Amino acid sequence: MMDFGFSALTLARMQFAFTVSFHFIFPSLSIGLASYLAVLEGLWLRTGKPLYLDLFRYWVKVFAVAFAMGVVSGIVMSYEFGTNWSVFSDKAGGVIGPLMAYEVLTAFFLEAGFLGVMLFGMKKVGPRLHFTATLMVALGTFVSAFWIISVNSWMQTPTGFEMSPDGRFLPGPSWLAIIFNPSFPYRLVHTVIAAYLTTAFVVGAAGAWHLLKAPGNLHARKMFSMAMWMAALVAPVQIAAGDAHGLNTLEYQPAKIMAMEGHFQSHAHGAPLYLFGIPDDARQRLDYAVAIPNVSSLVLKHDWNAPLPGLDTIDPAKRPSVAILFWSFRLMVGIGLAMLALGLWGLVARWRGKLYEWRMLHRAALVMGPSGFIAVIAGWTTTEVGRQPYTVYGLLTTAQSASPLAAPAVAASLIAFVLVYFAVFGVGTWYIFKLLATPPHAGDQGLAIEQGKPLRSAGITPGPAQGEPHHQPETVE
């Protein structure tokens, strides 16, 4: 039997973890890139410097590939709700179904309406109309994140619902209570900032790569400079947002925080912060622990000696996996601190006038290029594993949510997904690397290379020749 010794439930969880992790790589880039493209085009319109237009055309190609792969991989997860998690869909569909439909009716239609203009309309509409299309696509990516995060947050902190006699979740008197559930604002801010940081480090890595090869490339200098500003300014904000999110989680999902901190036992007079340790879920202890006394109480309660309960106060059947949470959380935090360190290093280099000369800084930025993706996956692993053993926290368990499938059937689909994903998205990822390997240059035509065709459709909208900003000499600050 092709089940690899796992139950159907475990295989279904593995399959969803694989597909959702693979999927979120692309939205975390497209959300940030859409806003970055809007900034670049806005700067071009304001300053008239063709360098910004060149960078827009350079990155819009990467955005197109990432956006397409994000859409395709996202559709797969919708089908998984019906195949592997049909009981969950049946019981919670009354709440999450409309929320996901709202995403289609708002974000998807907004993106679909303006994406073609953004990608292919630079020579067909006026620059300000094109900029409006870019802004609408950026807004669409944010609105999409809004609805998806609302769905996930409701599963984490469910409010505003009613239970039917047969155990189904139904909308209560106010949809606002469902949408703006207790963890939603914190998770939305944390997720969107993570997407911006992810994009900043991808842009910074690309700029660093080309600076290492051609230090005088003005386009690479501008990319790198903008990315380092983002790292220095946004990384501290993300750390603060993460701290606020953690305090909210402590209030509504204390078992998740206990597992993240490695607190198997309660601490009556201040809990230590464990920097390192090997969690032993079976024996409920943390081996080889390296701790700083009382700091966990200081961070979580803002009181050096505040008591903190441990997992010994939670029913063993309702505890998440400490081993996974302990390390995924530390991986996320460690990368966040590394991002902050690189941003501060960039500030020092800028202050000394060496931002484009310190090759060690460029190499470090290159190494940190994929760090945002790793941190995002680690963060979502912390969020989702910490919710276990529930799909709807405290109300519907994961075991109760699964479809009545045989393990070999789920294993076969898991293998198929792995093979297809690595083949299809492997090619897409390779193509993105190919695009980034080509240095940005003046006169980049983006996706709008069309010979012998009209520059724009018939109508009264001014063409680019009438609305194009006056070009000014290039400088990199």
Ranges and model annotations:
Residues 2-477:
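Polytopic transmembrane helical bundles with strong interfacial aromatic enrichment
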